[in-house]
Regions:
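Hot-dog-fold acyl-thioester-processing enzymes
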Residues: 326-386, 442-469
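NAD(P)-dependent Rossmann-like dehydrogenase/reductase catalytic/cofactor-binding core
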Residues: 2, 24, 172, 206-327
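NAD(P)+-binding Rossmann beta1-loop-alpha1 motif at the extreme N-terminus of oxidoreductases
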Residues: 1-54, 103
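Rossmann-like NAD(P)-binding element
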Residues: 33-36, 51-109, 117
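Rossmann-fold dinucleotide-binding core
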Residues: 112-178, 183-187
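Active-site-proximal catalytic alpha-helix in oxidoreductases
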Residues: 16, 141-144, 150, 170, ...
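Hydrophobic beta-strand-centered segment that forms part of the acyl-chain substrate-binding groove
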Residues: 366-416, 430-432, 438
Length: 469
């Protein structure tokens, strides 16, 4: 059954929500009275189509459909999920919620992208307050997984569980904020850092670039993979968090922050910040900065994925839901993926070593298909590659979608030979690989025949592929 989402407000955040749902196979209807909405959303979608597939080593679902609507009623009438991303004014949000609830289903989730309002404030005067909750994202929504899911005591339990399931299904991380508070959790941290930054600029201690450098070369990297408290736990050494608190606790009474003392944003201070920001980043367009941001995020999150940590572990979990069985097609489609930006080299194309990785991934998919999966390997059996011959026929570029078709050339006892073809979207051949593998006992580290069930599957595939040649 096709899943349907309505996006009310198609700015940077609404457009990001739209892209996240659309690229995960949802049909989308969007309402935004801005005459430039379609153009702005197309810019966000262009970035998302370039970036999101690069996070995964499995193909995303086929894109859903996208329709621009002229009324809220048209957008929400059959939606399973409704995301409100209108300006941060409570009167506007109340008016929009009233229009939404006049036409939407009672079991639909209504999420608000608000960064500051509490759900109880959003629900005031609502016909069905149990539908409404805060689902606060982070820009770019199509890449960053955190969603602060904030219900009130009036929000329905079933709506909360449905929201969690839907958000998880599209690769997001719903952080259930159990007690509502102004600005939720993350924005309270951001506000504290922002206020301190304003003072550092106003007092002439640091420029915008120096503040950003302090973050991106230092604690920002630690926070990306461990957060605040786990970082400080390490700072406590072997004695742990209690030692850290005992050591640094006295600092709380020292003049290290002006947290509650906020400088007035005068015209002079505003212009100073704007001028420094222009000097720092004005040589790049917003589109160039967005692409740089996205490429950096992809590389960082893929590194975290390799370690099974933080946002990387979430990508792996979502990727597992995307993996499809190979089926009976001959040859088998063993890989379908987008080329990540961190796989390219100084020539601007995929490094030759990554061709080998893609063919290795194709062999892994074959092994899973014949039953030589993780359990089989854990039981002490596997296949080792003894020889490969790769021919590089054309370039592969970052963001390009490629697929691999694999044919079994030989299945003879402990020996198996595969032939892989890597192809572009237009079916042009980019590279080929002939791969010879031996079955190995992982205890003795010597070759041996595979178990009977695996041997049977290998032989059947080899025969089917021979007959279709």
């Amino acid at each position: 059954m096709t899943k349907k989402a309505a996006i009310i407000g198609g700015g940077v955040i609404g457009g990001g929500w739209l892209a996240r749902f659309l690229l995960n196979g949802w049909d989308i209807k969007v309402f935004d009275p801005d005459p430039e909405a379609e153009r702005k959303i197309s810019e966000v979608l262009k970035n998302a189509r370039h970036a999101l597939p690069m996070l995964y080593d499995q193909p995303l679902p086929n894109e859903g459909t996208l329709k621009f609507c002229t009324t809220i009623k048209e957008a929400v009438s059959d939606a399973d999920w409704i995301q409100e991303s209108v300006p941060e004014r409570l009167d506007i949000k109340h008016r929009v919620f009233a229009e939404i609830q006049d036409s939407c289903r009672g079991d639909a989730v209504i999420g608000s992208s608000t960064s500051g309002f509490k759900p109880s404030e959003l629900q005031e005067g609502a016909e069905r307050p149990e539908q409404i909750m805060v689902t606060h994202p982070f820009n770019p929504v199509y890449l960053l997984p955190l969603i602060e899911l904030v219900p009130s005591i009036k929000t329905g339990t079933q709506h909360i569980e449905t929201a969690k399931d839907i958000l998880t299904s599209i690769g997001l991380y719903p952080l259930h904020v159990r007690k509502e508070i102004d600005a939720h959790i993350a924005d309270r941290f951001l506000e504290a850092v922002w206020r301190e930054g304003l003072w550092l600029i106003k007092d002439g201690i640091a420029t915008t670039e120096e503040i950003d450098n302090a973050i991106r070369y230092g604690f920002g990297l630690r926070w990306a993979q461990m957060g605040l408290f786990e970082t400080y736990r390490i700072a406590g050494g072997e004695a742990g968090m209690a030692h850290f608190i005992a050591q640094f606790g006295p600092c709380l009474s020292w003049p290290w922050t002006k947290l509650m003392d906020v400088p007035e944003l005068t015209d002079e201070l505003t212009q100073m910040i704007a001028d420094q920001s222009d000097a720092q980043s004005g040589h790049k367009t917003i589109r160039e900065l967005e692409r740089l941001r996205d490429n950096n995020l992809i590389a960082i999150m893929r590194a975290l994925k390799q370690q099974g940590s933080a946002a990387g572990a979430l990508i792996t979990a979502h990727e597992d839901t995307l993996r499809m069985p190979l089926g009976a097609a001959v040859p088998m489609r063993t890989v379908s993926r987008s080329i990540p930006v961190d796989w390219t080299d100084y020539n601007g194309h995929m490094n030759e070593g990554r061709y080998g990785q893609i063919f290795s991934d194709a062999a892994d998919a074959f092994m899973i298909e014949i039953g030589a999966d993780a359990k089989y390997i854990a039981a002490g059996n596997s296949f080792f590659t003894a020889e490969t011959t790769i021919k590089y026929l054309a370039e592969a570029l970052a963001g390009q979608t490629v697929h691999v078709k694999t044919r079994v050339l030989l299945s003879e006892g402990k020996k198996v030979k595969l032939f892989h073809e890597m192809r572009a979207e237009d079916n042009a051949i980019l590279a080929t690989c002939e791969q010879f593998m031996l079955h190995v006992n992982l205890t003795t580290r010597k070759s041996c025949p595979p178990l009977a069930e695996v041997q049977s599957r290998m032989d059947a595939l080899a025969q089917a592929h021979k007959e279709s040649a």
